[in-house]
Amino acid sequence: MSRIGRLPITVPAGVDVTIDGAAVTVKGPKGELSHTVAAPISVERTEDGTLQVTRPDDERVSRSLHGLTRTLISNMVEGVTKGYEKKLEIVGTGYRVTPKGSDLEFALGFSHPVVVKAPAGITFAVENNTRFSVAGIDKQQVGEIAANIRKLRKPDPYKGKGVRYAGEQIRRKVGKAGK
């Protein structure tokens, strides 16, 4: 039995979970998320109000989807109650971020500014011109947008310049030895 998959999912007060066949919909104070559960996995509500994810057999596919499904539903419950946020920072001379409405405009050493549009469900918050955050209720979407922004100018291993996650340690390389 999957150690993660067999754990019950506690549903806090103010969160409504609807199970309609293979579709699981979670509504909370911050919004609504839905997920379609893969074929061999089933989700049931227990008497004490928690959710239990079960699998019919010990096939390899069932075992792999068991823990995954439980974690995805747990992330949905946490997302609609607390939400998710990724903090990023920019290091480098002349590198900065400015808010343009709901979008972000980056100056990252290119000959042109780079504009990142906020998709539905994602909000950007700019602390100062080198620190900002990506927030939303969908953990996967928040992480993907943050990774795409980081990919605009990955941290340089020699000088450390670029966009990085807050608190990320960049592995530095030694430059070539001069004579």
From Swiss-Prot:
The keyword Zinc-finger does not apply. Keywords: Ribonucleoprotein, Ribosomal protein, RNA-binding, rRNA-binding. One of its GO terms (molecular function) is rRNA binding. It comes from the Bacteria. One of its GO terms (biological process) is cytoplasmic translation. The keyword Repressor does not apply. SUPFAM superfamilies: Ribosomal protein L6 (SSF56053). GO terms for cellular component: cytosolic large ribosomal subunit. Part of the 50S ribosomal subunit. This protein binds to the 23S rRNA, and is important in its secondary structure. It is located near the subunit interface in the base of the L7/L12 stalk, and near the tRNA binding site of the peptidyltransferase center. PANTHER family: 60S/50S RIBOSOMAL PROTEIN L6/L9, LARGE RIBOSOMAL SUBUNIT PROTEIN UL6M. Belongs to the universal ribosomal protein uL6 family. This is Large ribosomal subunit protein uL6. It comes from Kineococcus radiotolerans (strain ATCC BAA-149 / DSM 14245 / SRS30216). The lineage of its organism: Bacteria, Bacillati, Actinomycetota, Actinomycetes, Kineosporiales.
